[in-house]
């Protein structure tokens, strides 16, 4: 049996925060604002996984009103989500992600993001795809006000 899930996340770019996407710290003059480390890609992946097993979203599991998640490492949050997926008897079939950002360029960091995510989801590198695009200077991402990410996951019964 297969289950599919879709995730989407967006965070505002601000000064004074590190930029962490896909578990990679990217050198840039701005970072993403959020209660946790605001890793927009890992949040989208977590939401996709939760959606695939019908378990809500990351806001339900890791509320921003709970101080224990303040500045939390999103990789640890995704690891907890993956434990829920495994408890339901599923494993990764494949994952496809898109980062939407005008700047900075993501290409130099994509392979490390893929490796990080494959490790977190206990999968092979060939099961994970990460790509990036711009909005051609349109909208909030085009104006460099924020970064968005989308993820689609396919899970299969073990």
Curated annotation (Swiss-Prot):
The record marks 35, 134 as: Transition state stabilizer. It comes from the Bacteria. Its cofactor is a divalent metal cation. Its EC number is 4.6.1.12. Homotrimer. Pathway: Isoprenoid biosynthesis; isopentenyl diphosphate biosynthesis via DXP pathway; isopentenyl diphosphate from 1-deoxy-D-xylulose 5-phosphate: step 4/6. InterPro entries: MECDP_synthase (IPR003526), MECDP_synthase_CS (IPR020555), MECDP_synthase_sf (IPR036571). It comes from Geobacillus sp. (strain WCH70). The keyword Lyase applies. Pfam families: YgbB (PF02542). 4-CDP-2-C-methyl-D-erythritol 2-phosphate binds at residues 9-11, 35-36, 57-59, 62-66, 101-107, 133-136, 140, 143. It catalyses: 4-CDP-2-C-methyl-D-erythritol 2-phosphate = 2-C-methyl-D-erythritol 2,4-cyclic diphosphate + CMP. Belongs to the IspF family. HAMAP family: IspF. PROSITE patterns: ISPF (PS01350). Binds 1 divalent metal cation per subunit. CDD domains: MECDP_synthase (cd00554). The gene is ispF. This is 2-C-methyl-D-erythritol 2,4-cyclodiphosphate synthase.
């Amino acid at each position: 049996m297969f289950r599919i899930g879709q995730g989407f996340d967006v965070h505002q770019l601000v000064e004074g925060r590190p930029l962490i996407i896909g578990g990679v710290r990217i050198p840039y003059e701005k970072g993403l604002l959020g209660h946790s480390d605001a890793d927009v890609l890992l949040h989208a992946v977590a939401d996709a996984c939760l959606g695939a097993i019908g378990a809500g979203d990351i806001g339900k599991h890791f509320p921003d009103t709970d101080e224990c998640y303040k500045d939390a490492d999103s990789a640890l949050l995704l690891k907890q989500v993956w434990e829920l997926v495994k408890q339901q008897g599923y494993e990764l079939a494949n994952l496809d992600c898109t980062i939407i950002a005008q700047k900075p360029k993501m290409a130099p960091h994509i392979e490390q993001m893929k490796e990080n995510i494959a490790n977190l989801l206990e999968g092979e590198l060939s099961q994970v795809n990460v790509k990036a695009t711009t909005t051609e200077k349109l909208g909030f991402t085009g104006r460099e006000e924020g970064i968005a990410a989308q993820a689609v996951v396919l899970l299969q019964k073990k």
